[in-house]
């Protein structure tokens, strides 16, 4: 059903998946990352500040899987829950993931992707640059 591009991290490639149809893995992507985001129908990601800012700026339907409180400061949990509350994201805690639950969540997200795009489009934060420029222009008068 899906074509998957998996960014695994340095030293975490799984060679047993090399010939899997519809699946490509990379340790890291730098210059092409914005192109991959632009081409994606949906994004599955951790919930770090940079990731969620990129996802929301591009209005990509997304599934956030935050690092657990044991593996982080807890900021990713807060980020993901905030985005979920605003209707921007679907969230699964790492501890609750099963193959079936992950696949069903992805299918639901894809089916309802327009509602996530619409929620992100309505965000008052989407025109932050315009607001800042407006404030600067007002101050310059």
Language-model-detected regions and their locations in the chain:
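Donor-nucleotide binding loops and adjacent catalytic segments primarily
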Residues: 1-42, 77-80, 92-101
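Alpha-helical elements of Rossmann-like donor-binding domains used by nucleotide-donor carbohydrate transfer enzymes
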Residues: 24, 39, 82, 101-108, ...
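A donor-sugar binding/catalytic signature common to diverse glycosyltransferases
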Residues: 33-73
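A general structural signal for well-ordered alpha-helical segments in protein cores
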Residues: 37, 52, 76-80, 99, ...
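Acidic, glycine-centered active-site loop in nucleotide-sugar glycosyltransferases
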Residues: 59, 77-89
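C-terminal "capping" alpha-helix adjacent to the active site of nucleotide-linked donor transferases
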Residues: 86-93, 97-114
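C-terminal alpha-helical cap of glycosyltransferases
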Residues: 111, 125-141
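A short, well-ordered alpha-helix in the C-terminal region of glycosyltransferases
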Residues: 114-126
């Amino acid at each position: 059903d899906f074509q998957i591009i998996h960014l695994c991290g340095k030293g975490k490639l799984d060679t047993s998946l090399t010939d899997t149809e519809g699946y490509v893995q990379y340790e890291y992507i730098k210059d092409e990352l914005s192109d991959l985001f632009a081409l994606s129908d949906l994004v599955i990601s951790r919930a770090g500040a940079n990731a969620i800012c990129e996802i929301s700026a591009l209005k990509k339907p997304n599934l956030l899987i935050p690092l657990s409180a044991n593996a982080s400061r807890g900021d990713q949990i807060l980020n993901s829950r905030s985005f979920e509350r605003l209707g921007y994201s679907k969230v699964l805690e790492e501890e609750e993931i099963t193959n079936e639950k992950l696949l069903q969540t992805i299918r639901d997200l894809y089916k309802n992707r327009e509602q996530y795009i619409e929620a992100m489009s309505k965000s008052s934060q989407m025109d932050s640059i315009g607001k800042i420029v407006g404030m600067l222009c007002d101050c310059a008068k």
